[in-house]
């Protein structure tokens, strides 16, 4: 069996509801007169954030900023959102279906503004009004989000809120790890804004979730290959599966060759650490 391990060395924090945490970030940032910039994956995560924002407005979890603008600035996210809006009951959970049955659009609310053209995108940063900006790519490696970072990283009143995993070597990871100077479009940018993270929102299961999935097999796997994680995490999760649950587990590095028919390794190289950008 091959299993991913993105969060194989930790448990997701579910103590505080994500809606409450997001509302706190919006409140704090708008109170300062800044922009809340959310690097977000275009499909799935952006729509999830819109769902939370609708709930925040409905429950009035942000005060003093009625109708605060929310810009969705990603062509792919806009197309994906349109598809979500056309989906039937089979695509939603019970809570969302109840909203649809009540005539409530689950991912739409007043104040949402769709940015289509590059001119629309540029106009967002020309508008001094405090706002929420959802833009891709989620790890800040490409896309319109990089322009919004250029205009907000240096502002003490703004916030960059990560809502998904940031892979090692990406700009998002460097910001999350606390880097104070980055280069965007050939310009050195000082990072003065607040950097935040919304925990538990990854589409990847944590250690317990992954272990529960493995336990679902009627017959225990003979060998578990652990991949899709940083080197330290894949090694740690493979070790955890062996020592705590009795699996024969292995975290292969790039170039490893295993003969399934013979049940043995043909090539087993050592790992090469990822260099930071």
Description of each model-found segment:
Residues 2-277:
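Acidic/His-rich, metal-assisted hydrolase cores and their charged scaffolds
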